[in-house]
Amino acid sequence: MARITVEDCLEQIPNRFQLVLAATYRARMLSQGHAPKIESRNKPAVTALREIAAGKVGLEMLKKVPG
């Protein structure tokens, strides 16, 4: 499987800071047992970035963070 790059993810979420926040939150969800939206055998952080690059997860992750 090809490596995931930040540039792949920036096509979906252009702001690097929002990208980091969304990926972090999604990786935490995956590590707590949520089902991945893509098929992946990688660690939660890589799976989260792959989901973002594929357009399966986006900035809506930031709206789910309790405030």
Curated annotation (Swiss-Prot):
One of its GO terms (cellular component) is DNA-directed RNA polymerase complex. The lineage of its organism: Bacteria, Pseudomonadati, Pseudomonadota, Betaproteobacteria, Burkholderiales. This is DNA-directed RNA polymerase subunit omega. The RNAP catalytic core consists of 2 alpha, 1 beta, 1 beta' and 1 omega subunit. When a sigma factor is associated with the core the holoenzyme is formed, which can initiate transcription. It comes from Acidovorax ebreus (strain TPSY). One of its GO terms (biological process) is DNA-templated transcription. Its EC number is 2.7.7.6. Gene3D superfamilies: 3.90.940.10. SMART domains: RNA_pol_Rpb6. It comes from the Bacteria.
